[in-house]
């Protein structure tokens, strides 16, 4: 049996392993295996006698065997009286699923009792937790025990999604006769609370989630029994009566506080001195001052009453003009009154002339009038004086100098027989009143117009031709337009040159 142990070239001699000096055992390394090694059939490596263990990556951080054995080298192994434990690993076949780690004891030492030497195995992968498992292995004291530890999850992480660790020892016991006896299977459960807490630390949680969990656990422990504050209505509801008088302090002492200051203020005589006993000088001055204030208040009320009434009504012109520049404003309503009188008188003549002329189109035609035929007729007027006058004062002076050439009243015109010339003249005046704005920015002064005798014959002639009538209406309408509209339209220079010539009636 001693020769058998020497043939194992890949065995690891176990020395006194302390808890402080623990190394990481890389089981994934290639372990050279001798060809003369006694292995079962079908368990040799296929690639040049080397065994590749890619299927098992177990970083063993702490593995401590304390059977009180001191083994330093092969020479000391032969001289020692204690058993030699050799750890050797063999790969599995394709059909096999169990890896064995066997601790073999030489047959020279037969009196060694395994029960007295417990095996303490540290197999935790997590760096923060250390779980110790103390187990006395080997119920058969006189037999060599190759002991195999089975790790079903060989992925390098034994605590991933597992709350319990099962360590099963599927081992066989070889006796001197070569018989194999099954060793009892045993399970290890780590029920430590510290291990369970470290499982949660290894889970995939970010720092924010961990802080949130700690805060939630903190708030669950805190019991806040806050009661709402009861608001007491200390202030009483304010109910104001319609005839309630506020308790103002009295300025006067009690005998004089009963005086009716309003009535005494209206009466100019000093009756309060007669009714009341003579008071002190300070009180007398105070009473006189209060009476003056009452009179002043009464006067202001009377003065402000008409102003309050005028604000609700339309504003009326109550003051006279202070200068001559304001005279057009005074004369403007007179013109408006005369125009308002012309409107009802002209309406009657308008109804008679509807059959002979298109009176509905007069306003449109007046805006589209062509000034090419404007010089055929002469009229008795002074348009140049109106054009040259730029101020309302000059307009009023020219209007006052020619009072005879003003327009006749519509009532006198309607008193004549209803001839065509009179009806046309009334229609011209009616359209001129429509063209007048109600509130023009400049004072409106109608241009004086007198038709010559020859014009009547010319107006009678175009009865047969309806088109020439419209042209005559256009001319008459434009002649009697107000000055403000004529100024905007800007008369042509040819018409201005013809206006300089005066009619024979005006020369007389």
From Swiss-Prot:
Q: Which Pfam families does this entry report, sorted A to Z?
A: FAM217
**Membership in a protein family:** Belongs to the FAM217 family.
Q: What is this protein called?
A: Protein FAM217A
Species the sequence originates in: Homo sapiens
């Amino acid at each position: 049996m001693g020769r058998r142990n020497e043939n194992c070239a890949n065995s690891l001699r176990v020395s006194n392993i302390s808890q402080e000096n623990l190394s990481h055992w890389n089981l994934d390394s290639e372990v050279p295996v001798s060809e003369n090694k006694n292995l079962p059939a079908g368990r040799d490596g296929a690639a040049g006698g080397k065994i590749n263990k890619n299927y098992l990556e177990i970083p063993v951080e702490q593995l401590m065997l304390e059977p009180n054995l001191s083994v330093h080298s092969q020479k000391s192994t032969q001289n020692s009286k204690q058993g030699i434990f050799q750890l050797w690993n063999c790969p599995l076949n394709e059909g096999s699923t169990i890896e064995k780690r066997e601790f073999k004891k030489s047959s020279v030492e037969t009196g060694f009792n395994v029960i007295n030497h417990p095996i303490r195995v540290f197999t935790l992968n997590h760096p923060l937790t250390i779980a110790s498992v103390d187990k006395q292995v080997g119920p058969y004291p006189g037999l060599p025990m190759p002991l195999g530890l089975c790790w079903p999850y060989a992925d390098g992480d034994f605590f991933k999604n597992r709350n319990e660790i099962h360590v099963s020892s599927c081992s066989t016991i070889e006796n001197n006769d070569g018989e194999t006896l099954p060793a009892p299977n045993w399970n290890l459960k780590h029920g430590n609370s510290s291990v369970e807490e470290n499982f949660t630390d290894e889970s995939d949680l970010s720092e924010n989630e961990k802080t949130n969990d700690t805060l939630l656990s903190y708030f669950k422990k805190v019991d806040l029994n806050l009661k709402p504050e009861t608001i007491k209505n200390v202030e009483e509801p304010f109910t104001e009566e319609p005839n309630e008088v506020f308790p103002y302090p009295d300025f006067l002492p009690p005998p004089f506080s009963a005086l009716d200051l309003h009535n005494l203020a209206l009466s100019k005589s000093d009756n309060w001195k007669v009714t009341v006993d003579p008071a002190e000088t300070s009180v007398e001055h105070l009473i006189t001052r209060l009476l003056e204030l009452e009179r002043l208040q009464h006067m202001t009320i009377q003065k402000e009453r008409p102003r309050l009434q005028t604000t609700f009504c339309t504003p009326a012109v109550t003051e006279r003009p202070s200068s001559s520049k304001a005279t057009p404003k005074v004369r403007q309503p007179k013109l408006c009154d005369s125009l308002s009188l012309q409107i009802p008188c002209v309406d009657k003549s308008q109804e008679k002339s509807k059959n002979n002329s298109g009176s509905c189109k007069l306003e449109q035609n007046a805006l589209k009038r062509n000034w090419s035929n404007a010089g055929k007729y002469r009229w008795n007027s002074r348009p140049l004086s109106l054009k040259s006058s730029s101020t309302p004062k000059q307009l009023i002076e020219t209007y006052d100098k020619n009072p005879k050439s003003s327009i006749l009243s519509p009532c006198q015109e309607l008193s004549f027989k209803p001839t065509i010339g009179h009806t046309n003249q009334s229609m011209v005046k009616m359209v001129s009143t429509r063209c007048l704005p109600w509130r023009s920015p400049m004072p409106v002064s109608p241009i004086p117009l007198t038709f010559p005798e020859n014009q009547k014959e010319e107006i009678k002639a175009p009865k047969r031709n309806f088109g020439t009538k419209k042209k005559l209406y256009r001319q008459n309408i434009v002649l009697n337009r107000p000055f403000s509209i004529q100024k905007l339209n800007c008369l042509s220079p040819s018409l201005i040159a013809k206006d300089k010539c005066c009619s024979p009636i005006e020369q007389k």
